[in-house]
Amino acid sequence: MSPESRIVELETRQAFQDDTIQELNDVVVEQGRVIQRLQLQVAELIKRYEEMVGQYGSEGEEAPPPHY
């Protein structure tokens, strides 16, 4: 293999690797956005749960059923 053909081969590989790195970066950025949205949703669900527990009390505070 001549030095020129080796250089061409290495440049070709680098070009493909650059494309792959960019694609992977795009995926990581999108996953970061998804994670951020999910964190906001979980925080909202926790807030709603805590509000519901505050309204109805915890399980230990429930009055006995009427038939007792």
Curated annotation (Swiss-Prot):
Matching InterPro entries: SlyX
Source superkingdom: Bacteria
Record Pfam families: SlyX (PF04102)
Gene3D superfamilies: 1.20.5.300
PANTHER family to which the protein is assigned, alphabetical: PROTEIN SLYX
Family: Belongs to the SlyX family.
Protein name (database record): Protein SlyX homolog
